[in-house]
Regions:
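A secondary-structure boundary/capping signal
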Residues: 23, 28, 43-45, 76, ...
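Sparse, context-dependent recognition of short Cys/His-centered cofactor- or disulfide-binding micro-motifs
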Residues: 5-12, 84, 133, 157
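Membrane-embedded segments
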Residues: 18, 35-130
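Conserved catalytic scaffold of divalent metal-dependent phosphoesterases
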Residues: 31-34, 49, 111-192, 196-200
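Short, surface-exposed loop/helix-turn segments at secondary-structure junctions
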Residues: 203-204
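Acidic, histidine-bearing metal-coordination/catalytic regions of metal-dependent phosphoesterases
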Residues: 1-40
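A broad, low-amplitude sensor of folded, mature protein cores
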Residues: 25, 58-67, 71, 155, ...
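A broadly tuned "polar low-complexity/structure-edge" signature
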Residues: 15-16, 22-24, 55, 60, ...
Protein backbone atom coordinates (compact mmCIF):
# COMPACT_ATOMS: atom_id res chain seq x y z
CA UNK A 1 0.00 0.00 0.00
CA UNK A 2 1.40 3.39 -0.99
CA UNK A 3 0.56 6.04 1.59
CA UNK A 4 1.19 9.60 0.43
CA UNK A 5 1.29 12.78 2.46
CA UNK A 6 -0.27 15.69 0.62
CA UNK A 7 -0.66 15.60 -3.14
CA UNK A 8 1.69 13.68 -5.38
CA UNK A 9 2.54 14.68 -8.94
CA UNK A 10 3.89 12.09 -11.34
CA UNK A 11 5.47 14.09 -14.16
CA UNK A 12 5.98 11.91 -17.24
CA UNK A 13 8.82 13.36 -19.33
CA UNK A 14 11.38 12.15 -21.80
CA UNK A 15 15.04 12.92 -22.34
CA UNK A 16 14.81 11.64 -25.89
CA UNK A 17 12.16 9.66 -27.79
CA UNK A 18 13.43 6.42 -26.29
CA UNK A 19 14.00 7.42 -22.67
CA UNK A 20 10.85 8.14 -20.67
CA UNK A 21 11.17 9.02 -17.01
CA UNK A 22 8.75 9.53 -14.15
CA UNK A 23 9.55 12.35 -11.75
CA UNK A 24 7.72 12.33 -8.42
CA UNK A 25 6.86 15.51 -6.52
CA UNK A 26 5.08 15.41 -3.15
CA UNK A 27 3.25 18.58 -2.15
CA UNK A 28 2.45 19.54 1.42
CA UNK A 29 0.12 22.41 2.23
CA UNK A 30 -2.21 23.43 5.04
CA UNK A 31 -4.83 23.90 2.32
CA UNK A 32 -4.89 20.15 1.72
CA UNK A 33 -7.42 18.61 4.08
CA UNK A 34 -8.11 15.00 5.02
CA UNK A 35 -10.36 14.53 1.98
CA UNK A 36 -7.88 15.77 -0.62
CA UNK A 37 -4.81 14.37 1.12
CA UNK A 38 -3.21 11.53 -0.82
CA UNK A 39 -4.46 12.52 -4.27
CA UNK A 40 -2.25 11.27 -7.09
CA UNK A 41 -1.96 13.48 -10.16
CA UNK A 42 -0.24 12.39 -13.39
CA UNK A 43 0.99 15.16 -15.68
CA UNK A 44 2.39 14.70 -19.18
CA UNK A 45 3.03 17.11 -22.02
CA UNK A 46 4.44 17.65 -25.53
CA UNK A 47 3.55 14.34 -27.14
CA UNK A 48 4.20 15.68 -30.68
CA UNK A 49 2.82 12.42 -32.04
CA UNK A 50 4.38 11.46 -35.36
CA UNK A 51 7.45 13.64 -34.79
CA UNK A 52 8.91 12.45 -31.49
CA UNK A 53 6.43 9.77 -30.43
CA UNK A 54 5.13 6.71 -32.26
CA UNK A 55 2.55 4.05 -31.40
CA UNK A 56 5.06 2.00 -29.38
CA UNK A 57 5.98 5.04 -27.29
CA UNK A 58 2.31 5.77 -26.61
CA UNK A 59 1.90 2.31 -25.12
CA UNK A 60 4.90 2.90 -22.84
CA UNK A 61 3.49 6.21 -21.62
CA UNK A 62 0.06 4.64 -21.07
CA UNK A 63 1.55 1.88 -18.93
CA UNK A 64 3.65 4.31 -16.89
CA UNK A 65 0.67 6.56 -16.16
CA UNK A 66 -1.88 3.85 -15.38
CA UNK A 67 0.64 2.02 -13.18
CA UNK A 68 0.21 4.72 -10.54
CA UNK A 69 -3.60 4.56 -10.62
CA UNK A 70 -3.85 8.38 -10.74
CA UNK A 71 -6.83 10.26 -9.37
CA UNK A 72 -6.37 13.10 -11.87
CA UNK A 73 -4.60 13.20 -15.24
CA UNK A 74 -3.40 16.45 -16.84
CA UNK A 75 -2.13 16.87 -20.40
CA UNK A 76 0.00 19.99 -20.90
CA UNK A 77 -0.41 20.60 -24.63
CA UNK A 78 1.12 19.88 -28.07
CA UNK A 79 -0.55 16.65 -29.08
CA UNK A 80 0.84 16.44 -32.64
CA UNK A 81 2.69 18.61 -35.17
CA UNK A 82 0.80 18.02 -38.42
CA UNK A 83 -2.71 16.96 -39.38
CA UNK A 84 -3.35 13.28 -38.67
CA UNK A 85 -4.80 10.75 -41.07
CA UNK A 86 -7.62 8.54 -39.87
CA UNK A 87 -5.34 5.70 -38.81
CA UNK A 88 -3.03 7.89 -36.71
CA UNK A 89 -5.96 9.72 -35.15
CA UNK A 90 -7.45 6.37 -34.15
CA UNK A 91 -4.16 5.27 -32.52
CA UNK A 92 -3.80 8.53 -30.60
CA UNK A 93 -7.42 8.41 -29.48
CA UNK A 94 -7.02 4.82 -28.31
CA UNK A 95 -4.05 5.88 -26.16
CA UNK A 96 -5.85 8.83 -24.58
CA UNK A 97 -9.02 6.84 -23.98
CA UNK A 98 -7.04 4.11 -22.19
CA UNK A 99 -5.78 6.56 -19.57
CA UNK A 100 -7.86 6.27 -16.40
CA UNK A 101 -8.40 8.77 -13.61
CA UNK A 102 -11.02 8.64 -10.85
CA UNK A 103 -11.65 12.38 -10.68
CA UNK A 104 -11.18 13.28 -14.32
CA UNK A 105 -8.80 13.99 -17.18
CA UNK A 106 -7.91 17.58 -18.09
CA UNK A 107 -5.97 19.30 -20.85
CA UNK A 108 -4.70 22.65 -22.00
CA UNK A 109 -3.72 23.56 -25.55
CA UNK A 110 -0.20 24.29 -26.78
CA UNK A 111 1.07 26.34 -29.70
CA UNK A 112 1.06 23.35 -32.06
CA UNK A 113 -2.48 22.46 -31.02
CA UNK A 114 -3.68 25.88 -32.18
CA UNK A 115 -2.60 25.05 -35.74
CA UNK A 116 -4.98 22.06 -35.85
CA UNK A 117 -7.36 23.17 -33.14
CA UNK A 118 -10.55 21.49 -34.36
CA UNK A 119 -8.90 18.09 -34.74
CA UNK A 120 -7.13 18.40 -31.39
CA UNK A 121 -10.30 19.45 -29.58
CA UNK A 122 -12.24 16.61 -31.18
CA UNK A 123 -9.67 14.01 -30.12
CA UNK A 124 -9.42 15.30 -26.56
CA UNK A 125 -13.14 15.69 -25.91
CA UNK A 126 -13.94 12.33 -27.52
CA UNK A 127 -11.50 10.66 -25.11
CA UNK A 128 -13.04 12.31 -22.02
CA UNK A 129 -10.51 15.11 -21.53
CA UNK A 130 -11.92 18.41 -20.30
CA UNK A 131 -10.11 21.30 -22.01
CA UNK A 132 -9.42 24.28 -19.76
CA UNK A 133 -9.12 27.30 -22.07
CA UNK A 134 -8.42 30.21 -19.71
CA UNK A 135 -10.86 28.52 -17.35
CA UNK A 136 -10.83 26.83 -13.98
CA UNK A 137 -12.46 23.73 -12.56
CA UNK A 138 -13.27 22.73 -9.01
CA UNK A 139 -12.35 19.08 -8.53
CA UNK A 140 -14.46 17.69 -5.71
CA UNK A 141 -13.21 14.89 -3.47
CA UNK A 142 -15.58 13.71 -0.72
CA UNK A 143 -17.09 17.16 -0.26
CA UNK A 144 -13.82 19.09 -0.43
CA UNK A 145 -12.24 20.47 -3.58
CA UNK A 146 -9.06 21.76 -5.17
CA UNK A 147 -8.91 24.33 -7.97
CA UNK A 148 -7.39 23.56 -11.36
CA UNK A 149 -6.66 26.62 -13.52
CA UNK A 150 -5.82 26.21 -17.21
CA UNK A 151 -4.05 28.97 -19.13
CA UNK A 152 -3.89 28.88 -22.92
CA UNK A 153 -1.02 30.23 -25.02
CA UNK A 154 -2.59 33.71 -24.87
CA UNK A 155 -3.13 33.66 -21.13
CA UNK A 156 -6.14 35.59 -19.87
CA UNK A 157 -5.48 35.46 -16.15
CA UNK A 158 -8.63 37.38 -15.16
CA UNK A 159 -10.95 34.91 -16.89
CA UNK A 160 -8.87 31.90 -15.93
CA UNK A 161 -9.06 32.71 -12.21
CA UNK A 162 -12.65 33.92 -12.19
CA UNK A 163 -14.38 32.50 -9.11
CA UNK A 164 -11.26 30.83 -7.69
CA UNK A 165 -11.27 30.77 -3.89
CA UNK A 166 -7.63 31.12 -2.74
CA UNK A 167 -8.52 29.39 0.53
CA UNK A 168 -8.57 26.14 -1.45
CA UNK A 169 -5.44 24.56 -2.92
CA UNK A 170 -4.96 25.81 -6.48
CA UNK A 171 -3.01 24.32 -9.38
CA UNK A 172 -2.23 26.38 -12.46
CA UNK A 173 -1.28 24.65 -15.70
CA UNK A 174 0.15 26.40 -18.73
CA UNK A 175 1.83 25.18 -21.87
CA UNK A 176 4.15 28.19 -21.89
CA UNK A 177 6.50 28.57 -18.90
CA UNK A 178 6.61 32.30 -19.76
CA UNK A 179 3.06 32.62 -18.40
CA UNK A 180 4.60 32.26 -14.96
CA UNK A 181 5.15 36.02 -14.97
CA UNK A 182 1.41 36.62 -15.46
CA UNK A 183 0.14 34.35 -12.69
CA UNK A 184 -1.04 35.76 -9.37
CA UNK A 185 0.69 33.56 -6.82
CA UNK A 186 -1.50 34.86 -4.02
CA UNK A 187 -4.09 32.59 -5.66
CA UNK A 188 -1.77 29.84 -6.88
CA UNK A 189 -0.05 27.16 -4.83
CA UNK A 190 1.57 25.11 -7.57
CA UNK A 191 2.19 25.59 -11.29
CA UNK A 192 3.01 23.12 -14.04
CA UNK A 193 4.25 24.05 -17.52
CA UNK A 194 5.33 22.21 -20.65
CA UNK A 195 6.85 23.40 -23.94
CA UNK A 196 10.43 22.93 -22.72
CA UNK A 197 10.11 19.25 -23.78
CA UNK A 198 11.16 18.16 -20.31
CA UNK A 199 8.50 19.80 -18.14
CA UNK A 200 8.80 22.63 -15.63
CA UNK A 201 7.42 22.84 -12.12
CA UNK A 202 7.17 25.98 -9.99
CA UNK A 203 6.38 26.12 -6.28
CA UNK A 204 6.07 29.67 -4.89
Amino acid sequence: ILILVGLTIYNITYVNPYDFTVRKETIKSNKIDDNTNGLIIAYFSDIHYGTFINEKHLKTIEEKINKFDPDIIIFGGDLFDSALNGNDQSKLSEFLRALEAKYGKYAILGDKDNEYIEQVKSILTDTDFRILDNQNEKIYVNGSYINLVGLNTNADVINAYDGVNPSNFTFAISHYPDNLDKVDFTKTDYMLAGHSLNGQVYIP
